[in-house]
A protein has these predicted regions:
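N-terminal core-binding DNA-recognition domain of tyrosine site-specific recombinases/integrases
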Residues: 2, 24, 28, 69-147, ...
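N-terminal DNA-binding module of tyrosine recombinases/phage integrases
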Residues: 4-10, 15-107, 275-316
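A short, basic/aromatic helix-end/turn motif that makes direct DNA contacts
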Residues: 25, 217-223, 376-382, 390-393
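Short amphipathic helical patch at the helix-1/turn junction of helix-turn-helix
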Residues: 133, 204-207, 365-366, 391
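Basic, Lys/Arg- and aromatic-enriched nucleic-acid-binding interface segment
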Residues: 148-151, 155-212, 216-218, 226, ...
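Catalytic-site neighborhood detector that most strongly recognizes the C-terminal catalytic loop/helix
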Residues: 170, 236, 372, 379-404
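Short, basic (Lys/Arg/His-rich) helix/loop patches that form interaction surfaces
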Residues: 185-195, 257, 275-377, 381
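Conserved tyrosine-mediated DNA breakage-rejoining catalytic core shared by Y-recombinases
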Residues: 218-276, 280-294, 298-300
Length: 406
């Protein structure tokens, strides 16, 4: 097991005179080692080669999809992309035999997805290009394994469609302040912990530009209250099925960010709630709730503890407690009210939670001396990862300039 120059963990070993290689995108070292161990066991048991030999012969697209998922794609971090794309292809041109596919089938796929529609749906150029790439990758792997032999090999050249990338939306300063006021007032009036946590999420995301999935994976131990920094080393992977699964960030690397006073105040409030929640039982919290007068913040904390909101932290060390109960679905559903308040009505999700990340990025590039390389380091973008080793962020400039100081 080794890490390549892009920061991706890779396998490269020899068994019975055969060399095996594989990459594990967006996986931590522990996850990659586990996947490599499972792979080696499959090879030793003979399952690996049996899969290839049994697949030779007539194979339809749906069978190819299952074969490639079991052999390759289930080891990738994003397990849905290839399946979704190939299922689109099957819906558009039918479950054809792989070896009989021709260039004409590719043009039929293009015409149906972009012009005629598939079951009444017209797909975007991005969706078509993704499906085309997935199909090309599948055919290349199958041909390389000699699972199929094409009667007339399809030519993918020149089929991709030009994509016009629109400008990423960002909120104006006045919109950020209106959103902050809206969330603050709702949190103050409501007894719901989720309303308070959405306000806290807004403060952090509008200052640090985290991906929502990164915020949902933060534990108290990721925050340095001594140095006013936060380390982002995890993200929630929502595409792997039911339940919360924590993996590496999108670029596979951790980063440490400086936090302004407004963000640290949020983190200190969260720590205070967690300390209280772990120090009293639900019965004790209910008793204290009835006894304490005047301190609304403390009363609400006891109320939430008495209702069992922090039961998930009782058996955890303090630094392992998650800082929020929100997840992707609840946060986005609650954010919809903010969109409507700002006047962004309709079903378009251009001003979803991710707009806060785009807003921070647009503000950072305006800082003096904050170039594109520093932006990519701060935001955790996946490209130019090899350049991140040479980036030296001006911590004081970032802390003073990032966010809106709400």
């Amino acid at each position: 097991m080794y890490k390549n120059k892009n920061g991706t963990w890779c396998s490269d070993f020899i068994m019975d005179g055969v060399r095996f290689q594989r990459r594990y995108p967006n996986s931590t070292e522990t996850e990659a080692l586990k996947l490599e161990k499972e792979w080696k066991e499959a090879i030793r048991k003979g399952v690996w080669e049996t899969n290839v030999s049994s697949a030779r012969g007539v194979m339809k697209l749906s069978e190819a999809l299952s074969f490639l998922h079991d052999r390759y794609w289930k080891y990738l971090d994003d397990t849905t992309n290839y399946r979704v794309c190939l299922n689109r292809v099957i819906k558009a041109i039918g479950d054809k035999e792989v070896s009989t596919l021709t260039t004409a089938d590719l043009y039929e796929l293009k015409d149906k997805m972009l012009n005629k529609g598939v079951n009444g749906k017209i797909y975007s150029p991005h969706s078509f290009n993704s499906s085309l790439v997935a199909l090309g990758t599948a055919l290349r792997i199958l041909e390389g394994l000699e699972v199929v032999k094409f009667k007339s090999k399809p030519n993918f050249k020149g089929l991709q469609v030009r994509q016009v990338v629109g400008k990423r939306p960002a909120l104006r300063d006045d919109e950020l302040l209106r959103a902050k006021e809206f969330l603050y007032n709702r949190a103050k009036k409501s007894k719901a912990l989720s309303s308070v946590e959405l306000y806290e999420l807004f403060i952090v995301l509008s200052n640090l530009g985290l991906r929502p999935a990164e915020y949902f994976a933060i534990e108290l131990g990721d925050i340095s209250f001594e140095y006013d920094t936060i380390t982002i080393s995890k993200a929630v992977k929502t595409h792997k099925g039911t339940g919360t699964i924590i993996g590496a960030p999108k670029n596979g690397q951790s980063r440490t960010l400086p936090c302004g006073e407004n963000v640290m105040e949020v983190f200190r409030n969260i720590r205070h709630r967690l300390e209280i929640a772990r120090s009293v039982s639900k019965v004790e919290a209910l008793k204290l709730l009835r006894e304490i007068k005047g301190n609304d913040v403390l009363r609400m904390t006891y109320y939430w503890v008495s209702q069992g909101a922090y039961d998930n932290c009782k058996d955890l060390p303090l630094d392992k407690c998650p800082i929020t109960h929100l997840n992707h679905d609840t946060a986005n559903r609650m954010w919809w009210a903010v969109r409507n308040h700002l006047g962004y009505l309709g079903t378009s999700n251009t001003h979803g939670l991710y707009v806060l990340r785009h807003t921070v990025a647009s503000r950072l590039v305006k800082l003096k001396g904050f170039n594109a390389y520093k932006l990519m380091a701060f935001m955790g973008y996946s490209d130019i990862k090899s350049s991140l080793h040479y980036i030296h962020l001006n911590v004081d400039d970032i802390r003073d300039g990032v966010g809106i100081s709400v």
